[in-house]
């Protein structure tokens, strides 16, 4: 408990919630408060100028970042026939139809990504209460409902990052590790920002990206100047 209190005190001394920092300054803060036990993830939060209450303004997507997170990704694929063979050949960890659905219902497996062929969505659609809360429900916008299951598996395994807005209109996504250099984080963040800009809803009004914050797994949320993320 004393270590936690010490770290909290350290964070309060380092971060003024009213200030906006450059990327370099933010990375210095994360380095000072990083855990000695593991390499913490670095997440980005974008406050968007959207109305999250309107379904056509929710933003979600996927991107393969310039610098991979180096995480081992476990993939489950709902498919049969040729698509199932393609999935197995591409290295999917779990492939099936009703049998795979039963494994999810019984919580027998834990995966990072779920992919489905279009035909298999009739089965996946019954798993909304199981996959939805975990953010695993396949969606065409993220390339996880597709006829090109092999390509989708390859993208997932290569470290493709998925992002989406929450109920408050804030978009979340992981862009690296605390051990990454500032230039690596900048390149990943810039790629994320460009992808999010492409997905701006046609009905969104006013400024689109209102503010940006970075946070580490164990560290603080730090407001960052969007200009410092642009290459």
Cite the ranges covered by each PLM segment.
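Residue-level signature of catalytic and energy-coupling elements of molecular machines
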Residues: 26, 87, 132, 214
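Flexible glycine-/small-residue-rich
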Residues: 46-48, 79, 117-118, 175-177, ...
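Long, charge-patterned amphipathic alpha-helical coiled-coil/hairpin "stalk" segments used as oligomerization
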Residues: 93-197
